[in-house]
Amino acid sequence: MTQETLKSDIKALLKERNAVLLAHNYMRDEVQEIADITGDSLALSIEAAKTDADVIVFCGVHFMAESASILAPEKTVLLPRLDAGCPMADMVSVEALREMKAKLPGVPVVTYVNSSAAVKAESDICCTSANAVKVVQSMSEKEIIFAPDRNLGSYIARFTDKKFHLWEGYCPTHERLRPEVVKELKQANPDAPFVCHPECNPKVVELADHVCSTTGMYDYCKKSGAKRFIIGTEAGILWRLKRESPDKEFILASPALICPNMKLTSLEDVFEALQQMTPVVKVTEEIRIPAKRALDRMLAIPRD
């Protein structure tokens, strides 16, 4: 079956199943191309919460499909590749988080959405890279537990005087971008602003001309007068950047910026998931209700 045939078959199945296809900005180009909506974790969470579709096909990783199930329990949520996990999300367990909470009684837990549903259920509020600063600034407490991304936590800490108890988690893909590589690129391309994701190492973030979520990158590059940009996030973002700003050049800061989990989902996987209506991701009510509380608190706060 050719890619074009696959795409038209997927479109037909989406219509037949009254399904919506959500794709994260880091997905393969051809998957983003057929998506009804592409976006970052926050945009896709909002979409999952408000869609009229009966079925949500989530092209992303496991925690994202869980978030869709938490926010839209009446929908069928399909994750074409059940093995598409997130190493960062796996770096925090419910048991370890409970231990930290016991050591710091009364200190609220702010959890990055890159976490399991069970961890969200132990949290006071969630955040994404697009709203993290506003989420933390909205809290009256003077100290917080921030999990699981130490890099995002370090970045947010710059904008507040709160005391942070940082979890020692990180994104292996973003962590691979080294400051010395960025310095060389900036020297070789002095006209190109370096735009990076706050999941990058703090030493890389210090070199950035602009730090933002993936959605923030699209907006920044569109509005900027610059014609060339050095991009410090996962390679999947390039497809939409080039589509939205075809007259501009985008230099990926490192060939190592590829997330193997985000690249697992193929058009064949999407087709099979729709055809067989499996694998389904469903969060149990006992976890869903407290996790939804943390997500709802986040969704009430405007994004950056």
Swiss-Prot record:
Cite the binding residues for iminosuccinate.
24, 41, 112-114, 129, 197-199, 214
Pathway given for this chain reads: Cofactor biosynthesis; NAD(+) biosynthesis; quinolinate from iminoaspartate: step 1/1
Report the domain of life of the source organism: Bacteria
- List the GO molecular function terms: 4 iron, 4 sulfur cluster binding; metal ion binding; quinolinate synthetase A activity
Is the Iron keyword given for this protein?
yes
> Which note does the record give on the cofactor?
Binds 1 [4Fe-4S] cluster per subunit.
Q: What is its main location?
A: cytoplasm
Query: Which family is it part of?
Result: Belongs to the quinolinate synthase family. Type 2 subfamily.
**Protein name, as recorded:** Quinolinate synthase
Name of the gene: nadA
